[in-house]
Amino acid sequence: MKPDIKICGLKTPEAIDRALERGATHIGFIFFEKSPRYIEPDLAGKLAEPARGKAKIVAVVVDPSNDELDEIVSLLKPDILQLHGNESPEHVLTIKALYGLPVMKVFSVRTADDLKRVEAYIGIADRFLFDAKAPKGSELPGGNGISFDWSLLSWLDGSIDYMLSGGLNKDNVADALVKTKARGIDVSSGVETAPGVKSVAMIDEFFDAVEEADAPVMASGS
């Protein structure tokens, strides 16, 4: 089965159009000001218009204030809130109640210990996203172009819905899909020529790689 594909950190209509043309199921906008992929909520709302009804619009936030969330939800009208900070299970429930939106909770992973917190969010977050933990000195919680040991996710059974992120690109995405039970994949730096600069050609290459990886599965099931 073809995975959900999220292109994150979008800032231009050209990249959004190509992502939609290639079948992206989710498009992500980043509202973390230190990120080179940061976008103002009003601009994100305008850029997201062609995607409505075609792909899920995801607002990516890091420990946001209520005022920040109010503005983002009002201007972007997202389908999903992606929480990439240290939000507690209680805070996740509060955010879901305030905005009536599903939440994708991100966990940054380097070792098995980083996954111990997941259990507390089962039944609270609507979906998980596992990303590589930022290297020392980085101010960015994600989008650093590094991967983690995917075997750390082997204990997760099929009942836990998650997306895989962290250093995915055209060269490793097929391997990632084989080695994990991820129902979705998330790419940002893997389709960029420079931080925050999406490449239409690299978006094409990424989708080509996913389709090639999926083809044997489809053939064997036919």
UniProtKB/Swiss-Prot annotation:
GO BP annotation list: L-tryptophan biosynthetic process
Entry's EC annotation: 5.3.1.24
SUPFAM superfamilies listed in its UniProt record: Ribulose-phoshate binding barrel
Matches recorded under Pfam families: PRAI
Gene3D superfamilies: Aldolase class I
Reactions catalysed: N-(5-phospho-beta-D-ribosyl)anthranilate = 1-(2-carboxyphenylamino)-1-deoxy-D-ribulose 5-phosphate
Pathway: Amino-acid biosynthesis; L-tryptophan biosynthesis; L-tryptophan from chorismate: step 3/5
The keyword ATP-binding is annotated on this UniProt entry: no
One term of GO molecular function: phosphoribosylanthranilate isomerase activity
InterPro entries attached to this UniProt entry: Aldolase_TIM (IPR013785), PRAI_dom (IPR001240), RibuloseP-bd_barrel (IPR011060), TrpF_fam (IPR044643)
Top-level taxon of origin: Bacteria
UniProt keyword terms in alphabetical order: Amino-acid biosynthesis, Aromatic amino acid biosynthesis, Isomerase, Tryptophan biosynthesis
Enzyme class: isomerase
PANTHER family listed in its UniProt record: N-(5'-PHOSPHORIBOSYL)ANTHRANILATE ISOMERASE (PTHR42894:SF1)
Similarity comment: Belongs to the TrpF family.
Protein name (database record): N-(5'-phosphoribosyl)anthranilate isomerase
